[in-house]
Every structure is written in structure tokens, then in C-alpha cells.
Swiss-Prot record:
Main location: secreted
Protein name: Somatolactin
Cystine crosslinks: C29-C39, C89-C205, C222-C230
Family according to the record: Belongs to the somatotropin/prolactin family.
Expression (tissue specificity): Pituitary gland.
PANTHER family: SOMATOLACTIN ALPHA ISOFORM X1-RELATED, SOMATOTROPIN,PROLACTIN
Span of the signal peptide: 1-24
Entry keyword annotation includes Secreted: yes
Keyword terms, alphabetized: Disulfide bond, Glycoprotein, Hormone, Secreted, Signal
Location in or out of the cell: Secreted
Top-rank taxon, per record: Eukaryota
Source organism (scientific name): Sciaenops ocellatus
GO terms (BP aspect): animal organ development; growth hormone receptor signaling pathway; positive regulation of growth; positive regulation of receptor signaling pathway via JAK-STAT; response to nutrient levels
Glycosylation sites (chain numbering): N145
């Protein structure tokens, strides 16, 4: 039953994957020379809509990837072990509000910079995750493709958020004291089980942060249209 569930999920994902790719509208922020020049030609409202769509898709695919990885490589007993062990997420130290009341109180400026902080903190770890999963025995192509897709779309999302900050705030990027190297270590795990659990924790934490990105961006959108009735 356990393997059948994973197989069925893989079949459905294979059928829906081309559709998901089709409906994803590119941000088109980067030209061949590497300069950000296409996004500035898009209206602020349309750019925000595209950024939100990217965040929605990234969260949806990260959720599917986490579930598929869980079913293929992490027995239920190990899922409980992760919860009991209290694995920490790499963004735990970030000064980003988590409760609804706290989020409602932060400014538009900090909303945008919080999203950018989350996006940039995950680019390296997702590249690492993509590399390690290539060495898994029996890892389905669907899982590998989803991980690669999310990694690429995250870079696109970063470009869109950077331009959005310039459009909405008319300023550059805030500098932070957090560095990706200080938050995430790329050491090789000597034990396969330990490596699997670390990768599972990364996927679970990214799914959580991807959802937070989506929530923050949708709150920003709400404030632009109906500031007095935002959830």
C-alpha cells in the first residue's frame, strides 16, 4: 500500500507536470547580458501579480516534492523522529514575524525585504539538495525534475522581487547580517540515513518558508487594493 501510494502520486504528477509548466508565466527579468531590464517595463501591478504566481507555484511544487520524497524515502517512524528531534530550519534566526498579528504590523518595505531574505537564503541549499538527490538510488525523475524546477524558479523569483523593491520603494536592497554560508553547511554526510533525514528536513523547511513567501506577497497585494480589509 505504501509503495502503491507513491507510485500513484508519481503517475498523477507525470500527467499534471506539463500543464504546470505551461501555466507558469516567466518573470523575464534577466537578459543575456545579465542586466535587469525587462521587468522594469512591466507595470508594478502586473509584476506583483507575476511574482505572486511564481510564489504560489513554487509552494505547490515544493509541497508535492516533500510528499513524494517522504513516501519514497522516509518511513513514518522516521517522520516522527524528525518531529521529536526538533530539527531546526536554516532561516529560524531570521527576524521575520510568524504570527498573524506580527505580520499585520510590519511595513510594506519590510514585507518585501523579508521575502527577498527568504528567497536568497534558499538558493544555495536547493542547489545542494538537487546535487545530493542525483546520487539517490531509485529517485524518480519526477522528484528530481521538480527539485530542479523549484531551484530555477527561485532565482527567477529573486529577480522579480529585486525589481519590485525598486519599483515600489524606489530604493536599493537592504543589506543584512545573515550569510548563506553561515547558516548552511555543505558537509558530506557519512551516514546515508543521516543524509536522507537532512535532505528531508531541508525540503520540509523550504516548503514552510515557501508558504510564508506566498502569504507575505499576498498580504502586500491586498494592501495595494483594500488596505482596510486585509486578513
Amino acid at each position: 500500500m505504501y509503495m502503491m501510494t507513491a507510485l500513484q502520486r508519481g503517475v498523477w504528477a507525470s500527467l499534471l507536470w506539463p500543464y504546470l509548466i505551461t501555466i507558469s508565466i516567466p518573470l523575464d527579468c534577466k537578459e543575456e547580458q545579465g542586466s535587469l531590464s525587462r521587468c522594469p517595463s512591466i507595470s508594478q501591478e502586473k509584476l506583483l501579480d507575476r511574482v505572486i504566481q511564481h510564489a504560489e507555484l513554487i509552494y505547490r511544487v515544493s509541497e508535492e516534492s516533500c510528499s513524494l520524497f517522504e513516501e519514497m524515502f522516509v518511513p513514518f517512524s522516521l517522520q516522527l523522529q524528525r518531529n521529536q528531534a526538533g530539527y531546526a530550519c536554516i532561516t529560524k534566526a531570521f527576524p521575520i514575524p510568524s504570527s498573524k498579528s506580527e505580520i499585520q504590523q510590519i511595513s510594506d518595505k519590510w514585507l518585501l525585504h523579508s521575502v527577498l531574505m527568504l528567497v536568497q537564503s534558499w538558493i544555495g541549499p536547493l542547489a545542494y539538495l538537487q546535487n545530493t538527490m542525483d546520487h539517490y538510488d531509485g529517485a524518480p525523475d519526477m522528484l528530481l525534475n521538480k527539485t530542479k524546477w523549484v531551484s530555477e524558479k527561485l532565482i527567477s523569483l529573486e529577480q522579480g522581487v529585486v525589481v519590485l523593491i525598486k519599483k515600489m520603494l524606489d530604493e536599493g536592497i537592504l543589506t543584512t547580517t545573515y550569510s548563506e554560508q553561515g547558516l548552511f553547511q555543505y558537509e558530506v554526510q557519512p551516514d546515508m540515513l543521516e543524509s536522507v533525514m537532512k535532505d528531508y528536513n531541508l525540503l520540509s523547511c523550504f516548503k514552510k518558508d515557501a508558504h510564508k513567501m506566498e502569504i507575505l506577497l499576498k498580504l502586500l497585494k491586498c494592501r495595494q487594493t483594500d488596505i482596510y480589509n486585509c486578513p
